[in-house]
Amino acid sequence: MSNTKITFYPVKNGDTNLIEFSDGASMLIDCKFRSEAEEDNDDYDVINDLLTNKLKTKEKGLPYLNAFVLTHPDQDHCLGFAKKSFLNKNPETAEPTKEDKDSKLILIGELWYSPRVFTEHEDDLSEDAKSFKKEAERRMKLWKNNDSTKNKPGNRIRIIGYSDVDDLKGIPDECISAAGDEICKMDGKKRTKYRFFIHSPFKNSIEGDSRNETSIVMQIRVDADGSKDAGKLFFGGDAEWRVWKKIQEKTSDKKNLEWNLFEAPHHCSYTFFSDDRDSEPEESSLNFLDNRVGNGYIVSSSKTIKKNNDNPPCQKAKNRYIQKLDDDDDYFKCTEENEKQVPVVFEIKSDGIWFDDGSKKKEQESKSSSIGKREHLYG
């Protein structure tokens, strides 16, 4: 059995994060599927890597992804979702067509949907966000109607958080998870090697007028080689500092705040630390970073971080993070360094998180190539 791997794909300011669990299941947290990379285009071809190297399981003749989580419906977190996914049809009653298969549309086993998050963004949803919501509503209807195919691959759904607008009557409690809940099931199966702790969205709004104050925030704890919770991963979309403050206030068991792999929220924006980049960081944000265990890593899913006025990414935020990494910038990774887009890959082992620098692949390429080493894409 292989170890769990986490890949942060380079999509400039945006998120496309793939987790390949040790039991063979896969989860994608957000997506930004740009146009396929061409020879004259430096954009990394995420879809090609997913379809060629990652999603090797097939269901109904389509590449199969066990779960897709949309932290919030901003376009840089769901771009290309509609074009690349098998949607709006029950795969049990409407078999994928030859065109669907030729297009290699991704069949998503289970959709993780937060009605509360969508409520805060409903005035300006993109077409991709609308497609996601429509698909979520299709799946919810199957559960409400107790359809015999509701728990089949491509029809499953997990509701994250509370809802002010969607009627959840008929959807079993086991498919609904609120802040403070731990999830040990994914895509219809009990998962014994990893678990998800939901921190946000909250039942009640928090003070502030930013749309980035509603987002799915979760901790994923992963076992490895007999070591329980060897990996402690945190994903929070674009959640700003008030969210992280409230998470700490609401969390009684401090193990649910620990991390050794943390994705810098909002593409390394300073909003994790404060509203204004010229302000001192909020004490609560610094306190959260103190929950690091072992040699933890922080990842910025963003364009190259420069000393300019961009926010995101923000050089000042990066500096704050590095200070909390014992001033060791080797533990801060960005998906684009010096304008070069490179997936950032980690592996969970019994003693924690390991950065995959691609050394094994480099060695294999060096041995197999008579004309020198090819450009290496994985770190």
Predicted regions and their residues:
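Active-site metal-binding motif and surrounding structural segment of the metallo-beta-lactamase
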Residues: 27, 38-111, 253-274, 298
